[in-house]
Amino acid sequence: MKDKIKDFVLGLGVDNVGIAAVKDYKSPRSPDLQGIFPGAKSLVVLAYQELSNCESENMQIAMGGRLDILEFARSSNYRVARFLEREFKTKAITVPPSYPLHMSYETRGTVGDVSLRHAAVAAGLGNFGRHNLVIHPKMGTRVVFTAVITNLELPSDPPTTEKLCTDCNICVENCPAHALDEEGKTDDMKCLKNSQPYGIGSAIRFWTKFAESPTEEQKKMVKDVNFWRLYQAGSIGFQYFCFNCMKSCPVGQE
């Protein structure tokens, strides 16, 4: 059964796939999967190679590569879920690679309903590096994950036991926000302020100032390039301006 599922996934052009039993999925911050999908028993975790776009200093090109993956990933997720439902008469739900996220004062939009990193580790697709990202045995850190949760009972794939991180500290040295200074923790707010400069924080500041400004100043504000960038980032859903921790990691790039 697992081989049939994996053959289907790989036939879509997905780079790798792993399977994890829900009991082996351990995420310290994300909610219990049973609250999302009562009766959930397994996760089918899909892995996608990040394109070389991430190396570009042109952030439009870099982000364009990520958007390409996200579009393909959503389509693949849907097709895998439908395959499971059709072939095995089971229920399946998709877990997106990013947004939508639960927005609350507690999580501040930084905690996913499913931790795809922990799901990937549980599915044998790698282990954590110093940058707190998952390192895949072949693709290194340049990998994006999605998942499909099902009530089909499947055993977990063997874990990746080899330590893949070389502790070179290049990721820490290349983080302009110093979000990785404390080992074992990513300072989400420092990271987001730098990597998403036109995210929700900037939008709040812009619209607060806009509301408090006279009409003539408001006209100037909406004609300013800062507003244009906010508009574009909002239209995309989010827009990264930093891929340093991912692209600087040497593992898998030899």
Protein language model features and the residues they cover:
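Catalytic cores of enzyme domains
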Residues: 68-254
